[in-house]
Amino acid sequence: MTAVVRRTRWTAVAAAGAVLAALAVGTAAGPASAASGPAAVVRQDAAVPPLDRAAVRRVLAGLPTSEVSGALVHVSGRAGRLDAVGGIGDPATGRAPDADGRFRIGSISKVFTATVVLQLAAEHRLDLDTPVQHYLPGLLPASFPPIAVGQLLNHTSGLPNGADGPWGDGTAAWFVDHRFESWSPERVVATMDGQEMAFVPGTAQQYNGMNTFVAGLLVEQVTGHDYAHEVQQRIVRPLGLHDTSVPAADDPALRHPAARPRLTVPGPDGTPRQVDVTEQSPWPWAEGGLISSAADLDRFVTALFRGRLLPPAQQEALFTVPDVPTHHSSHCETGPDAGRACMSMGLERTKVGGVEIWGKTGSRPGWTNGVFATRDLSRTVVYSLNPTGLDGAETPVIMQLAGAVFG
């Protein structure tokens, strides 16, 4: 599998994170995790400006375009609130996106997974410095070196990307033809068989969804319960997240969708046609298969940042970035600290307009999403766009929204 395909598979969703980083005026290194070496504490050094609601609405008024059919934006915090939509949510009816509807959150699922693993660490049911091979013997190739659990969470494991799998060739046409195929997490992890490690664990950072598949299997091994059960009992139910779920592997449905996105692909005669991709396999599972809504993601991040889900030691890990370089990663490659790690055990850190924000991007074909907040929650933003392709052409819209939301 080529490097281009690997980039499409795990990091096409990173376009939003890269855009936010591109807007950054600077980032600094955060405190280190036990698994990854030294780091320094980061402080927010710019106040959040008043929310320019008109600027956000102007961006949304430019939709639909050939690259983005619709979008929703949810902003909260003491510096201003807004719920707004733009473009078309359902091309069949022409209706606008539903600001209260659900969408496939993609890699934002990783934050839920990391939170559960950190909770298990707080309960002394696993140790972040213990090799994952201790808990899951035989899962990884025997040739792989010991990989600490914490290194899975902050992407310093050095795991390879995996060979041919459910991501195909990364094109919209391939996805449309295979969108209902389901892969088990074990089968996805097995695509690493025969591959070499990308780097020595703990020496660099490379965004890789394979880390989170292994972390999800770790949750099941340690608890004896399904991953979905643990997310439900530990996060969804306590916080009252009524729109958030981990779909069953054989359930492609999306109930009460915010939008019914369509991908543009070549028809039989070569002319473009649009295919509704609302229903699709949730095979990304703990790595990227969850469903949620803007309100639920806001509630989750608010509880997470306020320490309602994690005790102090694990909360510190959530806001800790290892002091290591990146390794062939689309993340952390812009701004004054380009080439240095920007991801913690669950979150990504960047700056926009001098304001330090933490959060996560995530996408599935048909959706490009993000949830970011200042650590003091003076501003939280959730966005969900509906791109018509898989080539990152929605990036300019995200840039405009980021600039409008954070000034």
Residue ranges, per PLM feature:
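Catalytic loop of the DD-peptidase/beta-lactamase superfamily, centered on the K-T-G motif
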Residues: 2-3, 30, 34-85, 275-407
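Residue-level preference for non-acidic, small/hydrophobic
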Residues: 60, 79, 113, 117, ...
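Hydrophobic (often cysteine-bearing) scaffold residues that line and stabilize catalytic clefts
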Residues: 52, 56, 105, 109, ...
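Short, surface-exposed loop or secondary-structure junction motifs
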Residues: 144-356
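Solvent-exposed serine/threonine-rich low-complexity stretches and specific carbohydrate-binding patches
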Residues: 87-89
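Secretory targeting and sorting signals
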Residues: 1-36
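Short, solvent-exposed loop/turn elements at domain surfaces
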Residues: 82-84, 93-95, 161-163
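Short active-site loop at a secondary-structure junction
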Residues: 67-69, 93-150, 199-208, 285
